[in-house]
Swiss-Prot record:
Pfam families the record matches: Ribosomal_L5, Ribosomal_L5_C
Keyword Ribonucleoprotein: yes
Name used for this protein in its record: Large ribosomal subunit protein uL5
Source superkingdom: Bacteria
Species name: Vibrio campbellii (strain ATCC BAA-1116)
């Protein structure tokens, strides 16, 4: 079991129950899933780019990504409905906890000029979204084998009802919020 999951069960639940005075343990917010998304707009011209992006995503997440397709045609972007334009992965359970641990302790500190992530990126329902400009911050990615530096979106979905509860949950995991 991931260390972060043990820490959640042993410390975070008690801490948040006291802070928000919950009456039941089931009211305590928990992380439900982490979604990684990588848009590869250049894949219209070169299918190899999407394959490489999917391989990077699989290496980062530990599971095979789903290829996302365009929902509708947009002439300005030169895409048609059904064109493969990106990939995404939804992490739950053990893989989710392991990814979160790697993100907080290894990947984010490797970002150049890192001063913390914005505490304002909550959606109003306790879910947190952030972007990473380079996939090479993850230690699994071999810098020499990368064909192109790509970014990805990371969404942490929680069961929290408000942004305040979601922020408290992530802060309990020592999530590096900007001061």
């Amino acid at each position: 079991m991931a260390k972060l999951h043990d820490y959640y069960k042993s410390s975070v639940v008690a801490e948040l129950t006291k802070q928000f005075s919950y009456t039941s343990v089931m009211q305590v917010p928990r992380i439900e899933k982490i979604t990684l998304n990588m848009g590869v707009g250049e894949a219209i011209n070169d299918k190899k780019l999407l394959e490489n992006a999917a391989a990077d995503m699989a290496t980062i997440s530990g599971q095979k990504p789903l290829i996302t397709k365009a929902r509708k045609s947009v002439a300005g972007f030169k895409i048609r409905e059904g064109y493969p334009i990106g990939c995404k992965v939804t992490l739950r359970g053990e893989r989710m906890w392991e990814f979160l641990e790697r993100l907080i302790s290894i990947a984010l500190p490797r970002v150049r000029d890192f001063r913390g992530v914005s505490a304002k990126s909550f959606d109003g329902r306790g879910n947190y979204s952030m972007g990473v400009r380079e996939q090479i911050i993850f230690p699994e990615i071999d810098f020499d084998k990368v064909d192109r530096v790509r970014g990805l979106d990371i969404t942490i979905t929680t069961s929290a009802g408000t942004d305040e509860e979601g922020r408290a949950l992530l802060a309990a995991f020592n999530f590096p919020f900007r001061k």
